[in-house]
Amino acid sequence: MRNRALSILLAAASLLAGCGGGSDPKITVAVIGDMPYGTSPTDTSQFLANPAFINAINLDPDVSLVLHVGDIHSGKEFCTEAYDKAVFGQWKAFRSPLVYTPGDNEWADCHKIKEGGGSYNAATGKIDFALDAKGAQIDYAGGDPVANLQLVRSIYFAAPGKAIGGSTPMAVHSQAQEFDAAFPADKAYVENVWYEQSGVLFVTLNVPGGSNNDTDPWYGAPAMSAAQAQEVSARSQANNRWLATAFQRAMSNADRAVVIQLQADMWDLDGAAPSHVTQYKQFIDAIASNAKAFGKPVLLFNGDSHVYRSDNPLMAGAPCVIETAPGATAAPCNTASVPAATGNPDPYLNQPYGYNVPNFHRVTVHGSTTPLEWLKLTIDPAADAANGADAFGPFNWKRVKP
């Protein structure tokens, strides 16, 4: 009986640990993405500037966690093992633990010829791989996306259940360790994690941008291969199961808010037709339904489109601000401030499926161009801000240029 009573007390304490109690401390998170970028395979300027940028974040005594929303190089740079390891080596210098979700440029788009992959030859029905001066394939595994994702996992997620670096190691819950037993293949997604800080649940999802959730046929082939179709289907289903798991945990722990971290800007047309973002609808649907059921602030961070933006694309006509030039102060979204290639200035109209989720907010992190910057996110358990351009619920944020 005594042991049973003790078990009940411990279980209650565990539940309270995630709750919105007054004892939760205020914390600060640095959010970055789409960096270091190069304008060509030989442009190393941002890569060489990265250690100083990391040090600038380290020098902020408030920061206790770093998030990277994906893309460790540009779409004009090659996918090599040496480069992936070099960036990982730089990240070891972060004083705070780093949580990273992969971007399209380091795996899903590695097949592209401009990234050193190759191109489909209609005459032969085979792939003409990009070769270096010695006749060797430029990219790791010839740019095969699945192989490059495995490479990223082997470097950045070699220790499942642990964040990257930091002077004090941080544990996370990985889908590789906590997958649904009914779907054992989900254990492959070591990059999908969740964890809690100050009564806020954070969750990452592997959703690559720029290619309609990796459905653009690899190497420019006429249609997706069986391997590509399997990749897309398995990852998408695993993502949605993981998102549901995270929200279930947030609700059972009475967390005060949820942060979602992924790479794709699912509302950016990027110069293509609206049909080129349809494969993201499944994730938007899942986010919208889970956020609505949760009923508390849900904040999404993404990269991909490179320009700082703050809005709520799950509400038609919601306020929106956008960076009008690299480093410029954000201005209201309209036809003058939003590039035409992006689509409608109201992001809801790029995915207009009847969403009405007032407790949601999205921030696209500045990336790609200089001046380099990071987003300083403060989580104050005592705050309850209205949904605005730079604050929502326990969150407030500002752009920082070192």
What does each model-found stretch correspond to?
Residues G38-S40, S74-K76, N105-H111, S211-T215, ...:
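Active-site environment of divalent metal-dependent phosphoester hydrolases
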Residues M1-I8:
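Bacterial N-terminal signal peptides that target proteins for export
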Residues F78, A82-A234, A316-I379:
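Extended active-site neighborhood of metal-dependent phosphoesterases/phosphodiesterases
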Residues L16-G18:
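C-terminal motif of bacterial Sec signal peptides marking the signal peptidase cleavage site
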Residues T28-G33, S64-S74, P97-P102, E106-D109, ...:
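Structural recognition of the beta-strand scaffold that forms the well-ordered cores
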Residues G22-Y83, D255:
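N-terminal active-site segment of His-dependent metallophosphoesterases
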Residues H361, T369-P402:
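A short C-terminal boundary segment appended to hydrolase-like catalytic domains
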Residues N55-L65, E196, V203, Y219-L314:
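His/acidic metal-ligating clusters that form di-metal
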